């Protein structure tokens, strides 16, 4: 498998990304269906590991999984003014079925606040029915004009949580719990991607939300990627769909609702945070194959010797490590090394007749390519050594990504400095502007306010655009 298939990041970052998606066998563009992709086995296996880790966290916070219809009556979408305005350009409609025009068109689910709101209005009657904490794993469709595998596609896969509460304080607590205890915790611990937790501006918040919170990550080209969002919807959807309950004083009240979601774009974040010019790099916790063993032999006698040693060695791994023994005879060891390196397998073990005689193996770690990442280690205690190494690699990938973000984030005090810094990464600045100011900056620089970080310096400075005094800092960046 020749290395020339991967464009170097320094030559064309976008093509490098597309090459990895293709050559690491993660996905393929579905050219017969506009804007869609086929997620291949290796890519879906990564998503399944993500799902498992997220689902455990979602259930640990008291939520249950449900499934709502894919098709939503168009009238539902029209009920919430901000919501319909925000999603109108992206919706796909079904107008015919069974050979006839439908009396009312259906919208193919872009998100489910409206149809879930309808059913919540039927299910909630009393304060005793609250909180209602549900999540669903689903595919959605948004008619995106410019698509890129995983990062922005017409159809994608996600989880969307939808909850209803008796008070605004409870809804706000839920919104922040999901942001911190589920999303940020998952992305940092499982994906090894550092994130900034923040509040979206009025311009950037979810259509129809009271407040939108987010986690933002930096990719290797300095751009931001929104890795997850958690929305306090206030009573907007409750009023639109008449989600009411009788409180403890026998008074009818509107519920307070939330929604939150992450999607398969996290696979794109994983690629662009950790991968290199050799191919995909995966954090061990999300690697479908954590260890690949490549037996090396020249004849049947050596094969029997080496495979017996491999079988004995890997017997202790079952239930502890996700591993694969690549004993294909129609590919050379060099081809196999390149293939598994390209697919991002964290650890490669090579075993030949000499290794069997010495009771050693050659061990190569994916996060350090070439000779620097290769060593010869004893077979005794190998299982524990690999487990420790995988933990070390998980931490090292996070620390490397964090160091990169810090090196490419700078405080700016003038608009000229801001324009210069967004060419390199994140610009942190004091901000007292309004939505019109944000729009002008975006038109002039293609940068947006990614978030208002929840951690603020507690000091006062002058707005980078208006010059007014403020104690609020924001993060500007170009984004995916």
From Swiss-Prot:
Its main location: cytoplasm. It is found in: Cytoplasm. One of its GO terms (molecular function) is ATP binding. SUPFAM superfamilies: C-terminal domain of ProRS, Class II aaRS ABD-related, Class II aaRS and biotin synthetases. Pfam families: HGTP_anticodon, ProRS-C_1, tRNA-synt_2b. GO terms for cellular component: aminoacyl-tRNA synthetase multienzyme complex; cytoplasm. It catalyses: tRNA(Pro) + L-proline + ATP = L-prolyl-tRNA(Pro) + AMP + diphosphate. It comes from the Bacteria. Its EC number is 6.1.1.15. CDD domains: ProRS_anticodon_zinc, ProRS_core_arch_euk. Catalyzes the attachment of proline to tRNA(Pro) in a two-step reaction: proline is first activated by ATP to form Pro-AMP and then transferred to the acceptor end of tRNA(Pro). Belongs to the class-II aminoacyl-tRNA synthetase family. ProS type 3 subfamily. HAMAP family: Pro_tRNA_synth_type3. Homodimer. Consists of three domains: the N-terminal catalytic domain, the anticodon-binding domain and the C-terminal extension. This is Proline--tRNA ligase. It comes from Chloroflexus aurantiacus (strain ATCC 29366 / DSM 635 / J-10-fl).
């Amino acid at each position: 498998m020749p290395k020339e298939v991967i464009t170097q990041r320094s030559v064309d970052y976008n093509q490098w990304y597309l090459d990895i998606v293709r050559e690491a066998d993660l996905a393929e563009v579905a050219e017969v269906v506009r804007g869609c992709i086929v997620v291949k086995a290796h890519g879906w296996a990564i998503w399944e590991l993500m799902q498992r880790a997220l689902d455990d966290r979602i259930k640990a916070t008291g939520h249950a999984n449900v499934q709502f219809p894919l098709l939503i009556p168009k009238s539902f979408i029209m009920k919430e003014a901000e919501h319909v305005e925000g999603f109108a350009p992206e919706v796909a409609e079904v107008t015919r079925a069974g050979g006839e025009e439908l009396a009312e068109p259906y919208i193919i689910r872009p998100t489910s606040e409206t149809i879930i709101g309808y059913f919540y209005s039927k299910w909630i009657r009393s304060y005793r029915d609250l909180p209602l904490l549900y999540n669903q794993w689903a595919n959605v469709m948004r008619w995106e004009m410019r698509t890129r595998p995983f990062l922005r596609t017409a159809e994608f896969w996600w989880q969307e949580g939808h909850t209803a509460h008796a008070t605004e304080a409870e809804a706000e607590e839920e919104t922040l719990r999901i942001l911190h205890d589920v999303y940020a915790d998952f992305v940092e611990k499982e994906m090894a991607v550092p994130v900034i937790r923040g509040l979206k501006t009025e311009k950037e918040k979810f259509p129809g939300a009271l407040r939108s919170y987010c986690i933002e990550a930096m990719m290797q080209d300095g751009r931001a990627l929104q890795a997850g969002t958690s929305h306090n919807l206030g009573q907007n959807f409750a009023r639109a769909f008449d989600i009411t309950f009788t409180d403890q004083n026998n008074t009818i009240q509107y519920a307070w609702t939330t929604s939150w979601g992450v999607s398969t774009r996290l696979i794109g974040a994983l690629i662009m945070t950790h991968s290199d010019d050799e191919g995909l790099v995966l954090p061990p916790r999300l690697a479908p194959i954590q260890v690949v063993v490549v037996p090396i032999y020249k004849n049947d006698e050596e094969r029997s010797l080496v495979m017996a040693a491999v079988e004995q060695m890997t017997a202790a791994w079952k239930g502890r490590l996700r591993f694969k023994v690549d004993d294909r005879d129609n590919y050379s060891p060099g081809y196999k090394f390149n293939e598994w390196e390209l697919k991002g397998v964290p650890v490669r073990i090579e075993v030949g007749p000499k290794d069997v005689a010495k009771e050693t193996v050659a061990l190569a770690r994916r996060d350090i390519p070439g000779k620097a990442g290769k060593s010869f280690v004893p077979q005794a205690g190998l299982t524990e050594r690999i487990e420790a190494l995988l933990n070390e690699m998980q931490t090292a990938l996070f620390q490397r990504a964090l160091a990169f973000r810090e090196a490419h984030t700078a405080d700016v005090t003038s608009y000229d400095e801001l324009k210069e810094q967004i060419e390199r990464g994140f610009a942190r600045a004091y901000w007292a502007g309004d939505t019109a100011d944000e729009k002008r900056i975006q038109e002039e620089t293609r940068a947006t306010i990614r978030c208002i970080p929840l951690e603020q310096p507690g000091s006062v400075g002058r707005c980078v655009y208006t010059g007014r005094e403020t104690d609020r800092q924001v993060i500007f960046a170009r984004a995916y």
